[in-house]
Amino acid sequence: MTDTFWAFVGLVLFLALLAYFKVPEMIVHRLDARAKRIKDELDEALRLREEAQEVLAEYQRKHAEAEKDAQEIIAAAKREVEAVVSEARTKAEEYVKNRNKLAEQKIAQAEADAIRVVSSSAVDLAVSAARVLIEQELDSNKANELIKESLFEESLTKMKAYLN
């Protein structure tokens, strides 16, 4: 019996002792438990990855919606600004038009007043000239008589009113 034989016997006894205490089953059990734990962690990681992808997709969808809403709001604001500017321009043009019309009316009124004043002055001048000529042409008795009867004054007043 050599040393190798005794080493072999020792090895067989050691392996038998390990089998008796169920060490290989414990090792297999621990390895299975560890493999299960690793598999569970991988499954959890996959689930978290899928969840993260869903969250990312949801975020991207919401971001796209927000971008679209922002573009719609900007477009609506631009349309509203254009409408306000157009309305302001229309009101300004209308205001200028009304002011021009009012100025033209004032000018026409001033022209009419000037014509009336000139016409009235011309009538007064004509009446005065007529009075002077009539007084010069008539003798003083007849002139006094006409003035006393007020026919002359009344006819001059009527003529003045008619010419004005």
Curated annotation (Swiss-Prot):
The record's subcellular location field reads: Cell inner membrane
Which InterPro entries does the UniProt record give? ATP_synth_b/b'su_bac/chlpt (IPR002146), ATP_synthase_B_chain (IPR050059)
Transmembrane stretches, by residue range?
A: 4-24
Topology term for the membrane: Single-pass membrane protein
Any Pfam family hit:
ATP-synt_B
Sorted alphabetically, the Gene Ontology cellular component annotations on this record are: plasma membrane; proton-transporting ATP synthase complex
| An example Gene Ontology molecular-function term | proton-transporting ATPase activity, rotational mechanism
Q: Which UniProt keywords apply?
A: ATP synthesis, Cell inner membrane, Cell membrane, CF(0), Hydrogen ion transport, Ion transport, Membrane, Transmembrane, Transmembrane helix, Transport
Q: How does it assemble?
A: F-type ATPases have 2 components, F(1) - the catalytic core - and F(0) - the membrane proton channel. F(1) has five subunits: alpha(3), beta(3), gamma(1), delta(1), epsilon(1). F(0) has three main subunits: a(1), b(2) and c(10-14). The alpha and beta chains form an alternating ring which encloses part of the gamma chain. F(1) is attached to F(0) by a central stalk formed by the gamma and epsilon chains, while a peripheral stalk is formed by the delta and b chains.
Return the similarity comment: Belongs to the ATPase B chain family.
Q: What biological function has been recorded for the protein in this entry?
A: F(1)F(0) ATP synthase produces ATP from ADP in the presence of a proton or sodium gradient. F-type ATPases consist of two structural domains, F(1) containing the extramembraneous catalytic core and F(0) containing the membrane proton channel, linked together by a central stalk and a peripheral stalk. During catalysis, ATP synthesis in the catalytic domain of F(1) is coupled via a rotary mechanism of the central stalk subunits to proton translocation.
Recorded protein name is ATP synthase subunit b 2
User: What is this organism's lineage?
Assistant: Bacteria, Pseudomonadati, Pseudomonadota, Alphaproteobacteria, Hyphomicrobiales
Protein's gene: atpF2
